[in-house]
Swiss-Prot record:
<dbReference type="InterPro" id="IPR000417">
    <property type="entry name" value="Hyethyz_kinase"/>
</dbReference>
<keyword id="KW-0808">Transferase</keyword>
<keyword id="KW-0479">Metal-binding</keyword>
<dbReference type="Pfam" id="PF02110">
    <property type="entry name" value="HK"/>
</dbReference>
<comment type="pathway">
    <text>Cofactor biosynthesis; thiamine diphosphate biosynthesis; 4-methyl-5-(2-phosphoethyl)-thiazole from 5-(2-hydroxyethyl)-4-methylthiazole: step 1/1.</text>
</comment>
<dbReference type="GO" id="GO:0009228">
    <property type="term" value="P:thiamine biosynthetic process"/>
</dbReference>
<keyword id="KW-0784">Thiamine biosynthesis</keyword>
<feature type="binding site">
    <location>
        <position position="189"/>
    </location>
    <ligand>
        <name>substrate</name>
    </ligand>
</feature>
<dbReference type="GO" id="GO:0004417">
    <property type="term" value="F:hydroxyethylthiazole kinase activity"/>
</dbReference>
<keyword id="KW-0418">Kinase</keyword>
<dbReference type="GO" id="GO:0009229">
    <property type="term" value="P:thiamine diphosphate biosynthetic process"/>
</dbReference>
<dbReference type="GO" id="GO:0000287">
    <property type="term" value="F:magnesium ion binding"/>
</dbReference>
<comment type="similarity">
    <text>Belongs to the Thz kinase family.</text>
</comment>
<comment type="function">
    <text>Catalyzes the phosphorylation of the hydroxyl group of 4-methyl-5-beta-hydroxyethylthiazole (THZ).</text>
</comment>
<protein>
    <recommendedName>
        <fullName>Hydroxyethylthiazole kinase</fullName>
        <ecNumber>2.7.1.50</ecNumber>
    </recommendedName>
</protein>
<dbReference type="InterPro" id="IPR029056">
    <property type="entry name" value="Ribokinase-like"/>
</dbReference>
<dbReference type="GO" id="GO:0005524">
    <property type="term" value="F:ATP binding"/>
</dbReference>
Length: 261
């Protein structure tokens, strides 16, 4: 898609989040800064109905409860019925048995179009040896790009692995996105924001691999622009929102930094 940001801002897709309580505010604000409309409906009594009127569903397991999992399954089933893209951010997989079991339950029960996580989280989901410290990646034995490609084929989905370089694969195509800045890792929530951004780009582009690649290029470019004006995490966070708000397709076109493997 040549002008995804213009399309997002013209159509203002509604992005339904069932997400974690730590970064819910940040995800809502970032979705809005890009030009889409966020909604955070978690109750099992209404979540499926909200999904039905949305353009994408973003699930984030950062602060899990049994009720939240029930809501995620209800909403994902509703999204599957209507061919609405579903993004799963596998936050903290590998840290606890409950988290691992619930992530596996989601994947076994509904179709996820885009699975996102850091290197350790995706490796753990894919059955590889990996270490996770809380919700942070520590180490992975296998080649990340190969893990992403194989897992994408196995799940018939797009896999997004975030890190110093972001890896996106649909099992056939694999992209390495190099946009971004180290300050993005200094504030809580940028990984969760990335999942929201992937969701809103998927809402306007049915090629989910291309959508995820663009989402991370645009977000990473915003981080680079914000870092140039910042003296630390506090000022960076403010500038990040401003740079996203003032972003344009034309500006990102010259900044995109990715390669296809």
């Amino acid at each position: 898609m040549n002008e995804p940001l213009k399309t997002i801002r013209e159509t203002k897709p509604l992005i339904h989040h069932i997400t974690n309580w730590v970064t819910i505010y940040e995800c809502a604000n970032m979705t809005r800064a890009f030009g889409a409309l966020p909604v955070m409906a978690h109750a099992p009594e209404e979540c499926a109905d909200m999904t039905k009127i949305s353009s994408a569903l973003v699930l984030n397991i950062g602060t899990l409860t049994s009720e939240i999992i029930d809501s995620m399954l209800l909403s994902a089933a509703a999204a599957n019925e209507r061919d609405i893209p579903v993004v799963l951010d596998a936050v903290g997989v590998g840290a606890t048995k409950f988290r691992d079991e619930m992530a596996a339950k989601i994947l076994a029960s509904v179709h996820i179009d885009i699975i996102k996580g850091n290197y350790s989280e995706i490796a753990k989901l894919a059955g590889e040896n990996a270490e996770t410290k809380g919700v942070e990646a520590t180490s992975i034995d296998a080649d990340p790009a190969k893990v992403a490609k194989a897992f994408a084929k196995a799940e018939s989905c797009v896999v997004v692995m975030t890190g110093k370089e972001d890896i996106i694969s649909d099992g056939d195509r694999t992209f390495i996105v190099k946009n971004g800045h180290e300050l993005m890792g200094s504030i809580v929530g940028t990984g969760c924001m990335a999942a929201s951004i992937v969701g809103l780009f998927a809402a306007v582009n049915r090629d989910y691999c291309d959508a995820a690649k663009d989402a991370l290029c645009y977000f990473g470019a915003s981080g680079e622009l914000a870092a140039a004006k910042s003296s630390g995490p506090g000022s960076f966070k403010v500038h990040l929102y401003d740079e996203v708000f003032n972003l344009s397709d034309e500006k990102v076109k010259s900044m995109k930094n990715f390669e296809e493997k």
